[in-house]
Amino acid sequence: MINWKMIYKIMGFLLFIEAGFLSLCIALSAFYEEPDLPAFIISTLITIAVGIPLSYAGKQAERKLSRKDGYIVVTFAWILFSLFGMLPYFISGYIPDITNAFFETMSGFTTTGASILDDIEALPHGLLFWRSMTQWIGGMGIVIFTIAVLPIFGVGGIQLFAAEATGPKFDKITPRIDVTAKWIWTIYFGLTLTETILLMAGDMPLFDSICHAMTTTATGGFSTKQTSIAAFNSPYIEYVVTSFMFLSGINFSLLYLLFLKGSFKRVFGDTEIRWYVKTLLFFTVVITTGLLITSPMGLEESFRKASFLVISLQTTCGFITADYMLWAPPLWMLTTIITYCGACAGSTSGGIKCIRALIMARIANNEFKQILHPNAVLPVRVNGLSVASTTKSTVLAFFTVFVLLVFAGWFTMMCIGLNFDDAYSVVISSLANVGPGIGMCGPAFSWNALPDAAKWLSIVYMLIGRLELFTVLLLLSPTFWKKR
């Protein structure tokens, strides 16, 4: 049986949390005396007004959550946050279209970074801050944040954690899941604060520094500038952002060991992080070499532009410092391959994730060996441990579903009216939560020109991709809702 009362209670509590974040924007708008202040006040009141009856409906709820309940909470949390998160855009009139307002908000909470805005700098400070905050909240997950306070309801939170934690592994830092979530957010906040200070040291204004630090740590990519990081024209800022995108693509369990335990050997001996670094280095070297050959850039600039782009795309952050569509075609075509890779499991990034790619590569390698040595026993090992057959099956299923979703979305986008290249780019950018793509969704364009039908399909794909495919797809299965 689905524990609807507990779900209502959690949803109500989540809306109170969102109202708290919205109230920060009220203070900011009041400080700058800008016209978005009434929109934030109204949005906050509406959010609280809906949260109260939901909390009331959850009174005397049975204090337990099944795994099925966890999947419902996670998916509904993202949808609910996006529905109420779009209110400031819509009420203020800066994004007067419901489709566009919901698209911008879902792109924020899923940390996709795709935007329908053609003039970002026209937004007042409150909306710009809210836009960045949607990514910061979504980066580590609305639900992981809630796990830290779920003991208020007497719920341990493991079911929510299992549904939200990205990738096939997410090592628990401590035996208690609520303590784990608190440590994760401590590291998350620490990275954001440190980057803010370093960006300010590079003469980026305080407001811009905070916004970019939030969206970097979340690997989201929303910027306060239409031309993203390129607007600041600063090699120092580019290197700072590159470094923090790289760190944010690492498993947060490993960041805990690195920063709080000083376990350098264990961190840099991790199989996945070695794969992560190797793929980043490989693509950086290839694109740097390509730029040296095909462009007038020098070595330092070629390396800086290449490393920034590769790390931005592989961590699915989506910041840009150059219009790579102006580069040689083989170079910008590489971007579509990079977006598939993703960063580490247990990070804020989207995409397939390095651990899955690693396991798939080793499964394929073993198949070749098995042909030559039919009787050999060839386990797939990660960090010296054999990967369970169930994990291998899950990874293979993920790849299969991911590819099927790409082709289904690709075909549907072309039926909507997009051309071959644009349809593919929109689908992969949405599903992998990357943001910038190629063609009409390249770094020099917004997504505003897309038909509404394409935007809604992108919204669905952003949500599916952010919640690791199966979480959302399970809810679409009739068997999920059958009573047992």
For each of these PLM feature ranges, what is it?
Residues M1-R484:
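Membrane-proximal intracellular helices of multi-pass ion channels
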